[in-house]
């Protein structure tokens, strides 16, 4: 699984696969709807030469990926020595129009003149619909091929530099009735020029080139997205009239302007990390919908195996994504996210497990009925706490009093009241909820740390608002939680933080001593534990138990973590966020050498575009799960920011 190139204008988002093919097309939200879900919906790119066709996903092609220096514009170099062809792509999603732009430099690597035909293929399951009611039609007068279903319309077109449009086309059914798709029509270099079809449909267009020995030509391709035929044809005609090159220039200019705060900071970043820092910042922006949702990952590859994907807004993940942006001075993204959370907030004051980009509840495997026999909302309390804590940090950073006017009564008060009330009076700890890793219903050290930090921060805001009732109530609960946590969640004999406590059916609690790095990190970063000597010892205990080595500084989430593990008896996968947490701890302690070794190792595991996966297999070194994972990118940025001398 990987999308080494992500392109976005915060409404249309496109993911390119390791073969340089369009594999995810999200519209009209980032993360929703994916119109290329499932097998065979990738948009193939093929070259016919010397009597046969070769697709980029075939053997023989090697692809190199990069981003332009200061813009979310992808660059791909695809070479096939066997057929003597090189394709150089520059790719972008236009920042003003909902359209994917691709310029393709087709190079003949042989000395003789050759007939070369470039094929661009489009395949959709529009709106993630299983109803097979899509339509594809050729519009010869507009030099476009359109795909539509209801209020989702796409228009594909292209020109050879000099103005000539595609010269052949084919439309048809794929994945049904024994048909593989219209791309197979290109096997002989010719297309059928069929003009309309409905059902599960695809299309292919051809550009015919005559390339001199070691010569080249450039093909310009675009795919417009809209909610009506009129809209996509308007975009299509603008690309033609303005030229694709002008649209690339406008898009590059927009990104250069947006990157100004990050570039200012990057001047103080070590040169070897500077480009990865900038790229990671752009990747975060690419996953933020203009209406506020922050998507965890748009890598839709898991859907090819009929699993759910990560194209949701987890409030907690969003907090970690937004924090480095706030630190660099970005305002709009956080403001829109808080608006999103305010709209999503339940009447009781909590946020749910995860959300779709349109604000609706996301899919969830969490039950209302819990192992201890209780029935309660299936929430992860740390998500509500994290958002509240981030808002307080955001306000402190900006000093913008209009934030309190807009959000204090409508979001801060209900969140803080919920957190203060969701406490077990016997333990003075938060009641059980699902843990950070979405697996266990229990009281965790990590969640406890976030709750007390959020309540302390909210109490400080209440002081500024002269809300004495809120300030006293929230600070009192926070102090009780912190005091109780130091007694119940730290094991002085093991010199370790517990994962947490599991509530039994009779209301008592049983300690869970599983070593979990989130417990250590939560206690450290959210100030849960005052005894610094014990805190340092707990971290060392964790590192010893995990046989940690700086030479290969990978760490799992917790003991015996089976998620994406290659085999039942294999070691648990390493998570980049956990290694970066440790680097942040080292920096706080003044151990810059150890931190830099971790940062360097993480950077070495990234794609050339800076893309980081969620996990890697510690044995094979293979990336696992989605890539990019915004949380990984964000922790990389946060750690780099921590290295900068204030």
Model segments located where?
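Polysaccharide-binding surfaces and accessory modules of carbohydrate-active proteins
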Residues: 1, 77-79, 83-188, 203-205, ...
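An extended acidic
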Residues: 1-81, 149, 154-183, 250-276
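C-terminal capping/lid segments that line or modulate ligand- or cofactor-binding pockets
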Residues: 1-46, 310, 321, 352, ...
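Low-complexity, Ser/Thr/Pro/Gly-enriched N-terminal "stalk/linker" regions
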Residues: 1-12, 20, 163, 182, ...
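Short Pro-Gly-centered flexible turn/kink motifs
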Residues: 65, 114-115, 208-231
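Helix-terminus loop motifs that line ligand-binding clefts
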Residues: 65-70, 75-77, 293-302, 312-313, ...
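Extended ligand-binding clefts on enzyme/binding-domain cores
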Residues: 155-178, 272, 276, 346-356, ...
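Active-site acid/base region of carbohydrate-active enzymes
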Residues: 165-179, 267-293, 338-366, 375-376, ...
């Amino acid at each position: 699984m990987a999308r080494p190139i992500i392109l976005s204008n915060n409404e249309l988002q496109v993911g390119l696969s390791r073969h340089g093919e369009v594999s995810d097309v999200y519209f009209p939200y980032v993360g929703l709807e994916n119109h290329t879900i499932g097998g065979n919906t990738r948009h193939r790119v093929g070259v016919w030469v010397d009597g046969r066709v070769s697709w980029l996903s075939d053997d023989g092609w090697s692809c190199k990926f990069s981003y332009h220096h200061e813009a979310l514009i992808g660059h791909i170099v695809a070479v096939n020595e066997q057929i003597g062809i090189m394709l150089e792509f520059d790719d972008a999603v236009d920042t003003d129009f909902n359209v994917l732009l691709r310029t393709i430099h087709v190079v003949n690597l042989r000395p003789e003149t050759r007939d070369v035909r470039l094929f661009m293929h489009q395949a959709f399951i529009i709106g993630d619909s299983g109803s097979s009611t899509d339509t594809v039609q050729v519009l010869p007068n507009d030099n476009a091929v359109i795909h539509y279903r209801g209020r989702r319309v796409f228009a594909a077109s292209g020109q050879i530099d000099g103005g000539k449009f595609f010269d052949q086309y084919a439309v048809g059914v794929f994945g049904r009735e024994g048909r593989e798709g219209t791309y197979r029509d290109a096997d002989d270099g010719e297309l059928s020029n069929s003009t309309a079809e409905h059902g599960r449909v695809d299309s292919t267009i051809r550009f015919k080139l005559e390339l001199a020995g070691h010569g080249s030509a450039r093909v310009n391709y675009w795919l417009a997205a809209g909610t009506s035929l009129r809209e996509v044809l308007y975009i299509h005609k603008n690309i033609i009239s303005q030229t694709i090159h002008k649209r690339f220039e406008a898009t590059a200019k927009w990104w250069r302007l947006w990157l100004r705060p990050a570039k200012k900071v990057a001047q103080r970043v070590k040169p070897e990390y500077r480009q990865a820092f900038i790229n990671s910042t752009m990747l975060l922006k690419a996953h933020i919908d203009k209406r506020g949702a922050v998507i965890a990952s748009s890598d839709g590859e898991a859907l090819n195996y009929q699993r759910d994907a990560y194209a949701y807004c987890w409030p907690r993940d969003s907090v970690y994504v937004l924090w480095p942006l706030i630190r660099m001075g970005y305002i709009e993204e956080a403001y829109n996210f808080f608006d999103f959370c305010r709209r999503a907030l339940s009447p009781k004051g909590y946020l749910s497990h995860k959300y779709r980009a349109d604000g609706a509840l996301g899919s969830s495997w969490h039950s209302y009925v819990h192992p201890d026999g209780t029935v309660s909302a299936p929430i992860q309390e740390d998500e509500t706490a994290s958002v509240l804590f981030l808002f307080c940090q955001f306000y402190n950073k900006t000093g913008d009093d209009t934030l309190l006017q807009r959000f204090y009564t409508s979001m801060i008060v209900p969140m803080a009241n919920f957190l203060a009330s969701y406490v077990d009076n016997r333990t003075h700890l938060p009641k059980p909820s699902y843990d950070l890793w979405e697996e266990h219903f229990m009281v965790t050290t990590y969640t406890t740390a976030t709750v007390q930090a959020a309540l302390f921060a909210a109490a400080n805001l209440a002081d500024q608002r002269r809300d004495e009732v809120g300030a006293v109530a929230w600070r009192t609960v926070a102090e009780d939680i912190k005091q109780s946590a130091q007694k119940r969640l730290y094991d002085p004999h093991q010199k370790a933080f517990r994962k947490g406590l599991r509530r039994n059916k009779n209301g008592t609690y049983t300690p869970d001593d599983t070593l979990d790095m989130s417990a250590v990190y939560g206690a450290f970063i959210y100030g849960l534990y005052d005894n610094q000597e014990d805190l340092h010892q707990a971290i060392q205990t964790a590192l010893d138990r995990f046989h940690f080595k700086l030479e290969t500084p990978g760490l799992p989430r917790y003991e015996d973590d089976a998620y994406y593990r290659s085999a039942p008896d294999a070691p648990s996968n390493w998570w980049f966020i956990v290694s970066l947490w440790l680097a942040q701890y080292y920096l706080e302690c003044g151990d810059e050498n150890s931190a830099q070794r971790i940062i360097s190792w993480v950077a070495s595991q990234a794609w050339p575009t800076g893309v980081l996966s969620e996990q890697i297999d510690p044995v094979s070194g293979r990336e696992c799960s989605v890539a990019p994972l915004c949380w990984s990118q964000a922790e990389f940025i946060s750690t780099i920011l921590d290295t900068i001398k204030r």
